[in-house]
């Protein structure tokens, strides 16, 4: 992991398309601004984990429904 120090209003550039700017620093919180192409998805880590968890739950429910349906068809 690369660790960099930046002050307020300073930026970090990733490749040719991404700029991360320190917008403000206040009471243990850092506000960041991101400039990136529209096709790039930018998510907070906890939101990405929540989406992945919901996808797993939905997949498990879908598998259960499919198995129940298949079981009923086999009984006929």
From Swiss-Prot:
Domain of life: Bacteria
Keyword Disulfide bond included in the entry's annotation: no
Keyword ATP-binding part of the UniProt annotation: no
Biological process (GO), any one: mRNA catabolic process
Stored Pfam families: CsrA (PF02599)
Principal location class: cytoplasm
Subcellular location: Cytoplasm
Keywords for this protein: Bacterial flagellum biogenesis, Cytoplasm, Repressor, RNA-binding, Translation regulation
InterPro entries for the chain: CsrA, CsrA_sf
GO MF, any single term: mRNA 5'-UTR binding
UniProt GO cellular component terms: cytosol
Subunit structure: Homodimer; the beta-strands of each monomer intercalate to form a hydrophobic core, while the alpha-helices form wings that extend away from the core.
Stated family: Belongs to the CsrA/RsmA family.
Function text: A translational regulator that binds mRNA to regulate translation initiation and/or mRNA stability. Usually binds in the 5'-UTR at or near the Shine-Dalgarno sequence preventing ribosome-binding, thus repressing translation. Its main target seems to be the major flagellin gene, while its function is anatagonized by FliW.
Protein name as annotated: Translational regulator CsrA
């Amino acid at each position: 992991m690369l660790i960099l120090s930046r002050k307020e209003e300073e930026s970090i550039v990733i490749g040719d398309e991404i700029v991360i700017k320190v917008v403000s620093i206040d009471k243990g919180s850092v506000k960041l601004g991101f400039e990136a192409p529209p096709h790039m998805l930018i998510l907070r880590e906890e939101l990405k984990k929540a989406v992945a968890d919901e996808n797993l739950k939905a997949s498990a429910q879908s598998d259960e429904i499919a198995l129940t349906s298949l079981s009923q068809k086999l009984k006929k």
